Regions:
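Enzyme catalytic cores with a strong preference for nitrogen-chemistry domains
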Residues: 1-294, 305-314, 321, 346, ...
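ATP/NTP-dependent adenylation/nucleotidyl-transfer catalytic domains that generate, transfer
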Residues: 13, 207, 233, 259-296, ...
């Protein structure tokens, strides 16, 4: 039996466009193998992943139904399709089902409805029913169990949390030749290797063929890596979809032979692939083609510029250098060298005249209050001047601003709202400063040349908002700060702050106090297991204070 795994990159909400994308993938599969019997999409391929409150709109749900009708008519003579789509629930009239829809013979019917635990982590859980069981589809004499299920943990794969119900064991007991796992699992560092190990175990333990079809593409802050899989009953992977690209994987379960794609060799490569795809899709799915960013001469903006060029092309990226009287000559020179290496157009706009104009214009209101030790007013004005300039350029260029802040800065609030915190997308907002340097080193190695100048690696990190300033004047050195941040926000650890070093309590307090900034900063691209903005929340107006 020949099956095509359609590793699609849908645009959420664009049902018309997604119908065409699925249709083209089916045609590509048929062109490669005219005998293809079944084509399978990822979960929610018709609507797009994470549709949110689109699901509350009747015309959107009706549009999904019409999309299925179109596919049924278009492929009434074959091949058969399994399409991930939202459909009306048969259990609760006020809800929908996240379903696997069998399209065949000019019509369609629901095979499986996604099973989820009561305490689902899925933000769309309020729109969907919990499902009951996974269905079996028979194609060319093969009995295929069709699985959509939110797993509790990888160790309890496909076990519904809080119950003894295991959809996988239910299917095995009913007798199947293979499993088709339709999914949309967001990328996080290291997660894909873990998932592949679990799938290998499942196929080998139950001696069944296993086809896993995963979504690919960026959707707001989430990135889906693709890397769909075909495994034989021994657990051997005999076909693997490309990472971070659309792909059509045609496999013959009877023979179990197909080319196997290369596997990512290191976490830095995976992160770079995710951030590049996430940036490209965020910009393009917002209906824009260009991006602008502030280039400071530091590592954060250097890496974001490199990612932007890979994602959008050098012709669609503009860098702005905005030196102040406190900027070093090296910062400007290093920025120019980087822009030239990447072939990016840039402009240099000194901000000293604007700093002087702001200081004069603001004097009457600032004089109402006395200054104080640690008064950052004029340092923040520099950042806000830069934020105004880069935002204005984005207006004129019809572009999006790419923010260059990292997770370490975001954790402790080392940024200026409406200044260096402006932007549409936080490209590296889920990478610590340590990780930023590691990914940048890998980037240069992968390119086979020194694109990011060595001087940027070697200089001490600094916002250059006052003479001789270094980041470590205000916050702990990053090699000390980053482990504390990871420990504080880790879901697994409840490590007493005192066990994390002498500055741990200070860092934890800053993390809590900076929540109001993080809530106003650009959408991050999520790549870690525990990102701010998705898996973390503390009160804005709280005060974390323990009894003595």
């Amino acid at each position: 039996m020949i099956t095509a795994l359609l590793q699609c990159n849908p645009v959420t909400g664009d049902i018309r466009g997604n119908v065409e994308k699925i249709s083209q993938a089916v045609r590509d599969a048929v062109a490669r193998s005219p005998q293809v019997n079944l084509c399978v999409t990822p979960e929610l391929a018709l609507s797009g992943v994470n549709p949110g409150d689109y699901l509350s709109m009747n015309d959107f749900v009706e549009g999904c139904r019409k999309g299925l009708d179109t596919l049924a008519e278009r492929f009434k003579d074959g091949p058969e399709l399994l399409v991930g789509a939202p459909v009306e629930s048969v259990y609760n009239a006020s809800l929908l089902s996240n379903a696997a829809v069998h399209v065949h013979g000019g019509g369609w019917d629901v095979v499986s409805r996604k099973i989820r635990p009561k305490s689902s982590r899925d933000p769309e859980a309020r729109f969907f029913d919990r499902g009951v069981s996974c269905g079996i589809l028979t194609v060319e004499g093969w009995r295929l169990g069709v699985v959509l299920c939110e797993s509790d943990t990888e160790a309890e794969f496909w076990t519904v949390q809080g119950t003894d119900h295991n959809p996988l064991l239910d299917l095995i007991a009913r007798g199947v030749d293979g499993l088709v796992y339709m999914t949309a699992v967001p990328y996080t560092m290291g997660s894909r290797a873990e998932t592949e190990a679990v799938l290998t175990h499942v196929a080998a333990r139950h001696h069944v063929h296993l086809l896993s079809v995963n979504a690919v593409g960026g959707n707001d802050g989430l990135v889906y890596s693709g890397q769909s899989l075909a495994l034989d009953p021994t657990g051997a992977v005999y076909a693997r979809g490309r990472a971070f690209e659309e792909d059509v994987l045609v496999v013959d379960m009877a023979e179990g032979s197909a080319p196997v794609a290369d596997v990512s060799g290191c976490w830095e490569e995976g992160v770079l692939g995710a951030l590049t795809l996430g940036t490209r899709d965020f910009v393009h799915k917002c209906g824009v083609s260009r991006a602008v960013l502030a280039l400071s001469g530091g590592m954060d903006s250097a890496l974001v510029l490199a990612i932007a060029v890979d994602a959008l092309g050098a012709d669609n990226v503009t860098a702005v250098l905005m030196p102040s009287p406190y900027s070093s000559r090296g910062s400007v020179d290093d920025s120019v060298e980087l822009a030239d290496n990447l072939g990016v157009k840039y402009v240099v706009v000194p901000i000293e005249p604007m700093m002087q104009a702001f200081a004069g214009a603001m004097k009457p209101c600032l004089d109402l209050f006395e200054t104080y030790e640690g008064d950052f007013t004029f340092e923040n004005i520099q950042a806000r001047i830069r934020g105004t300039l880069i935002s204005s350029l984005a207006n004129r260029a019809r572009a999006l601003v790419l923010n260059t802040g990292n997770k370490s800065e975001g954790a402790v609030g080392y940024s200026t709202l409406y200044g260096d915190a402006v932007g549409a997308l936080g490209v590296i907002a889920d990478l610590t400063k340590t990780q930023v340097y590691q990914v940048a080193e890998w980037y240069n190695k992968a390119k086979g040349r020194t694109v990011i100048p060595r001087a940027i690696f070697e200089k001490a990190p600094s916002a250059e908002l006052r003479p001789g300033q270094k980041d470590s004047d205000t916050i702990p050195p990053y090699d000390e700060l980053d482990p504390i941040i990871e420990a504080v926000i880790s879901a697994e650890s409840r490590v007493p702050a005192g066990n994390l070093g002498p500055r741990a309590e200070e860092v934890r307090t800053r993390i809590f106090r900076a929540e109001f900034k993080r809530r106003q900063e650009p959408q991050p691209l999520f790549v870690s297991q525990r990102p701010f903005g998705r898996a973390w929340s503390v009160p804005l107006a709280g005060r974390f204070r323990l009894p003595e």
